[in-house]
């Protein structure tokens, strides 16, 4: 029962992590306008994401534009896109594999095979969490580096958006769920070596009987 509870908890965390990754990759809130200087009121706020950028006017009107050309995008943005898509597919595959080998399903009857399937699902989810973590940390490092770079104009400086924080949380949920699934795998049973069987052997008396017969001859 404890193993089943850990599996359900791990799969629940993995589902939440997958949904968080999907929302983080879809929202254009990876980079937002940095409020630098004494003036708080600005004419517009810029949001930048993996797939589009949005401009929010001071009146509340928002205009979004999807990136048209893939080749015109920076290489770091292309890599972040690819890693996020691969992470989403891997996490979905890990969830399907976990459902197949879960204790509460009857897709596989063998208990040993179920344990190996759940362990595989946990490893896949751990890998998906790492793939989510790479573009999020990469983008955050680039934003912080440009923010403190005196050569970058203040109008071009950005701050960390909400999608980055959501991406960190989603990666943590995926890795935590994958770790719980790996912990549900039972340890291999080691057979204890059997000791030598103790028995009693009756000594042969043929030699003694032969000597006795020769003595009488």
Swiss-Prot record:
<feature type="transmembrane region" description="Helical">
    <location>
        <begin position="160"/>
        <end position="180"/>
    </location>
</feature>
<feature type="region of interest" description="Disordered">
    <location>
        <begin position="194"/>
        <end position="217"/>
    </location>
</feature>
<dbReference type="InterPro" id="IPR003553">
    <property type="entry name" value="Claudin9"/>
</dbReference>
<feature type="topological domain" description="Cytoplasmic">
    <location>
        <begin position="1"/>
        <end position="7"/>
    </location>
</feature>
<keyword id="KW-1183">Host cell receptor for virus entry</keyword>
<dbReference type="GO" id="GO:0005886">
    <property type="term" value="C:plasma membrane"/>
</dbReference>
<feature type="topological domain" description="Extracellular">
    <location>
        <begin position="29"/>
        <end position="81"/>
    </location>
</feature>
<comment type="similarity">
    <text>Belongs to the claudin family.</text>
</comment>
<feature type="topological domain" description="Cytoplasmic">
    <location>
        <begin position="181"/>
        <end position="217"/>
    </location>
</feature>
<feature type="topological domain" description="Extracellular">
    <location>
        <begin position="138"/>
        <end position="159"/>
    </location>
</feature>
<protein>
    <recommendedName>
        <fullName>Claudin-9</fullName>
    </recommendedName>
</protein>
<keyword id="KW-1010">Non-syndromic deafness</keyword>
<keyword id="KW-0965">Cell junction</keyword>
<dbReference type="GO" id="GO:0070830">
    <property type="term" value="P:bicellular tight junction assembly"/>
</dbReference>
<dbReference type="GO" id="GO:0043231">
    <property type="term" value="C:intracellular membrane-bounded organelle"/>
</dbReference>
<feature type="transmembrane region" description="Helical">
    <location>
        <begin position="8"/>
        <end position="28"/>
    </location>
</feature>
<keyword id="KW-0675">Receptor</keyword>
<feature type="transmembrane region" description="Helical">
    <location>
        <begin position="82"/>
        <end position="102"/>
    </location>
</feature>
<dbReference type="GO" id="GO:0005198">
    <property type="term" value="F:structural molecule activity"/>
</dbReference>
<comment type="function">
    <text>(Microbial infection) Acts as a receptor for hepatitis C virus (HCV) entry into hepatic cells.</text>
</comment>
<keyword id="KW-0209">Deafness</keyword>
<keyword id="KW-1133">Transmembrane helix</keyword>
<dbReference type="GO" id="GO:0042802">
    <property type="term" value="F:identical protein binding"/>
</dbReference>
<keyword id="KW-1003">Cell membrane</keyword>
<dbReference type="Pfam" id="PF00822">
    <property type="entry name" value="PMP22_Claudin"/>
</dbReference>
<comment type="subunit">
    <text>Interacts with CLDN1, CD81 and OCLN.</text>
</comment>
<feature type="topological domain" description="Cytoplasmic">
    <location>
        <begin position="103"/>
        <end position="116"/>
    </location>
</feature>
<feature type="transmembrane region" description="Helical">
    <location>
        <begin position="117"/>
        <end position="137"/>
    </location>
</feature>
<comment type="function">
    <text>Plays a major role in tight junction-specific obliteration of the intercellular space, through calcium-independent cell-adhesion activity.</text>
</comment>
<dbReference type="InterPro" id="IPR017974">
    <property type="entry name" value="Claudin_CS"/>
</dbReference>
<keyword id="KW-0812">Transmembrane</keyword>
<dbReference type="GO" id="GO:0001618">
    <property type="term" value="F:virus receptor activity"/>
</dbReference>
<dbReference type="GO" id="GO:0007155">
    <property type="term" value="P:cell adhesion"/>
</dbReference>
<keyword id="KW-0945">Host-virus interaction</keyword>
<dbReference type="GO" id="GO:0005923">
    <property type="term" value="C:bicellular tight junction"/>
</dbReference>
<dbReference type="InterPro" id="IPR006187">
    <property type="entry name" value="Claudin"/>
</dbReference>
<keyword id="KW-0472">Membrane</keyword>
<dbReference type="GO" id="GO:0030054">
    <property type="term" value="C:cell junction"/>
</dbReference>
<dbReference type="GO" id="GO:0016338">
    <property type="term" value="P:calcium-independent cell-cell adhesion via plasma membrane cell-adhesion molecules"/>
</dbReference>
<keyword id="KW-0796">Tight junction</keyword>
<dbReference type="InterPro" id="IPR004031">
    <property type="entry name" value="PMP22/EMP/MP20/Claudin"/>
</dbReference>
